[in-house]
Amino acid sequence: RKVIDTYNMEWREATRFYRQVKTAAYEPTHESKKFDFSFSDGKGRQLLLMYVVPILVGLKIVDISLYNQFVCGKSSKPLMDIYKDSDKGKWLATRLLNRNEAFEVEEGKSVVTVEQKIQQLYDAIFVTEYTGNVYHTILGEYEFDDNSKNFVKSVESMLSVYADYNI
């Protein structure tokens, strides 16, 4: 709903958006036993399915140039617009906190903001170049790697194992 409101989608666009998101990722985001998301990399994939794929679908419908900037690692604006000032964004950022981080001053922890955590999420998916020494990024209980970007793009295109055209 937040994507629809943020991008002022008309009825036709909103209907198309719901249909595409549902087709692309409904089953794995609704308590399916068919997919295992119990480890950190699986939790990362589940987070991508629930929080990033809908943004990609919405951007592709309303603003293809912003979509291209977003997936090429040039603009985190869509992710910020959706989550920065929302309760869902605060919840998401809390889950992305590492053990040594907090939103308020605590002994032995560095202070971070919701915006910083959302930016770190964006960077882990679309900006970080994973090489031999840097092969993954851990944010809280989630793991992202060099496949994360291709993963969200394939799910968004409805060409992944998660797509279900019978819904």
Predicted segments with their positions:
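Charge-enriched interaction surfaces
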Residues: 41-48, 66-69, 73-75
